[in-house]
């Protein structure tokens, strides 16, 4: 079996590529990083270090690589033969790789289906990718490929911090991972992927991850920044921050249990597992890296505003701990982050109310805005 994977970064190698190799795919990575591409071409394997209570080393074999700018024809040929095409490139890059994928699909001479899975930190990633790919196909080509190409939405979760090693291919990952794939668009048989979880409806899993992993990680980062901690682990050793994060995840968890019928005890166990992941001593992640892009994270459908709004809609109360996280985000003034600089400028010109109205789409008189402003007074 053949898988073409766009993105040979840490997530691509340490998560997606690793599982595909374990599932007996020959994995062809596609990337723009010449150093990584050459190393994969020369070695044909790399090491993934799983850092938990004990450390395990996994050798990922049967891999190769192609350069996304210099080897377009070869990439197209591989897509034409592939059983699976996956991505881990970032949402903004999906439009840039869509034409290459379209050209590969056009060259397919077989009726054998191909599944395409965008493993991005976004809702409906594969749906979006299909829209971009379809823009490069005629109506006749679209019709011909519709019953041969399944674009499967998914949710992915594994913490892979920034890192450097003597061998540029080596990557350290946490033991926990979750790859949930929706089956609605499967054509023929469900793809064979060891460790993946296939479900009929992805939405509950997307929101569970967003409201727990992403919400919790952001809270640790913004609260940790206020107290001048450098790493996520240092911040989690602060009992006040630990309490704030745990309380916020109980608030977001209450929404999930109410909305999707998750078992309350099971969801509490999930929260505890997520908190333990943040404490993992082997996963050293910088506070400023996790806190980056605060304007995006202040969006109405993102990790802080969405659970806070849902809580208010469901229960008619303002979630105090989530509001505290939003307050900490608004105080994130790290000069090395362009969005943080822009956010502080907006607050300076339009006030907290103006910033929340502009980026979070919250009216200035909303009870959440009132609570956030109150929380900021004590930080």
From Swiss-Prot:
PANTHER family: ALTRONATE OXIDOREDUCTASE-RELATED, MANNITOL-1-PHOSPHATE 5-DEHYDROGENASE. The keyword Flavoprotein does not apply. Belongs to the mannitol dehydrogenase family. It comes from Anoxybacillus flavithermus (strain DSM 21510 / WK1). InterPro entries: 6-PGluconate_DH-like_C_sf, 6PGD_dom2, Mannitol_1_phos_5_DH, Mannitol_DH, Mannitol_DH_C, Mannitol_DH_N, NAD(P)-bd_dom_sf. The lineage of its organism: Bacteria, Bacillati, Bacillota, Bacilli, Bacillales. The gene is mtlD. GO terms for molecular function: mannitol-1-phosphate 5-dehydrogenase activity. NAD(+) binds at residues 3-14. This is Mannitol-1-phosphate 5-dehydrogenase. GO terms for biological process: mannitol catabolic process. Keywords: NAD, Oxidoreductase.
């Amino acid at each position: 079996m053949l898988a073409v994977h766009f993105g040979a970064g840490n997530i691509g190698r340490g998560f997606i590529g690793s599982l595909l190799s374990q599932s007996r795919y020959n994995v062809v990575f596609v990337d723009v990083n010449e150093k990584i591409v050459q190393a994969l071409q020369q070695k044909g394997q790399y090491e993934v270090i799983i850092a938990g209570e004990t450390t395990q080393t996994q050798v990922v074999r049967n891999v190769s690589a192609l350069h996304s700018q210099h080897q377009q024809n070869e990439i197209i040929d591989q897509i034409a033969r592939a059983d699976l095409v996956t991505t881990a490139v970032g949402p903004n890059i999906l439009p840039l790789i869509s034409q290459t994928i379209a050209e590969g699909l056009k060259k397919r001479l077989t009726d054998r289906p191909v599944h395409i899975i965008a493993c991005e930190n976004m809702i409906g990633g594969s749906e979006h990718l299909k829209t971009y790919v379809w823009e490069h196909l005629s109506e006749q080509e679209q019709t011909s490929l519709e019953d041969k190409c399944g674009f499967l939405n998914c949710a992915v979760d594994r913490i892979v911090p920034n890192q450097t090693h003597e061998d540029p291919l080596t990557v350290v990952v946490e033991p926990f991972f979750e790859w949930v794939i929706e089956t609605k668009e499967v054509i023929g048989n469900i793809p064979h992927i060891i460790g993946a979880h296939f479900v009929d409806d992805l939405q509950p899993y997307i929101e569970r991850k967003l409201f727990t992993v992403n919400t919790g990680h952001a809270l640790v980062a913004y609260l940790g920044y206020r107290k001048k901690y450098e790493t996520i682990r240092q911040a989690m050793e602060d009992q006040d921050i630990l309490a704030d994060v745990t309380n916020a995840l109980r608030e977001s968890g209450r929404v999930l249990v109410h909305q999707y019928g998750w078992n309350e005890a099971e969801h509490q166990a999930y929260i505890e597992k997520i908190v333990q992941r943040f404490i993992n001593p082997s996963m050293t992640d910088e506070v400023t890296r996790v806190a980056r892009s605060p304007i995006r994270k202040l969006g109405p459908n993102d990790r802080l505003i969405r659970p806070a709004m849902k809580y208010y809609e469901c229960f008619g109360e303002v979630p105090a701990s989530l509001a505290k996280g939003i307050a900490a985000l608004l105080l994130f003034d790290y000069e090395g982050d362009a969005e943080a600089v822009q956010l502080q400028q907006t607050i300076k010109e339009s006030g907290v109310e103006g910033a929340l109205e502009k980026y979070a789409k919250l009216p200035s008189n909303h009870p959440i805005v009132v609570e956030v402003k109150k929380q900021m007074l004590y930080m």
